[in-house]
Structures are given as structure tokens and as C-alpha cells.
């Protein structure tokens, strides 16, 4: 059985953001605006997304 995945897209810049939030974006694998990645839907990933929710768009 395949694990459920989610698509995460960075929609706002990381310039002038908290260092912790920049690090969270890097941890998610996002590098630039409109960069989209597909991640496995886990509680840890969801927590990271919640922390930077104002900078990313999530598609189920």
C-alpha cells in the first residue's frame, strides 16, 4: 500500500523571515517561490507545514 502524499508549494519569499522558518522551509526541501515537492503525509511533516503555513500552499 502506498503512503499518502501531499504536494507542497512555496508561494511567498523566505527573505526577511525568522531564521527558524527559513530552516523549516529548507527542511521541507523548498528552495524558491513556486517550487513544488511531494512529501509523505506524516505528523512531523504536517507540523513543519503548520509552522510556515503563511508561505506555502498544500494540495492533498
Swiss-Prot record:
Gene3D superfamilies xrefs: Ribosomal protein L30, ferredoxin-like fold domain (3.30.1390.20)
Disulfide bridges in this chain: none
Lineage: Bacteria, Pseudomonadati, Pseudomonadota, Gammaproteobacteria, Pasteurellales
GO molecular function terms noted in the UniProt entry: structural constituent of ribosome
One GO term describing the cellular component: cytosolic large ribosomal subunit
Stretches of the chain forming a coiled coil according to its record: none
Name assigned to this protein: Large ribosomal subunit protein uL30
GO biological process: translation
A Pfam family reported for this protein in Swiss-Prot or TrEMBL: Ribosomal_L30
Signal peptide: none
CDD domains tied to this protein: Ribosomal_L30
Domain of life (superkingdom): Bacteria
Entry-linked NCBIfam families: rpmD_bact
Keyword terms, alphabetized: Ribonucleoprotein, Ribosomal protein
Subunit annotation: Part of the 50S ribosomal subunit.
Name of the gene: rpmD
Family to which this protein belongs: Belongs to the universal ribosomal protein uL30 family.
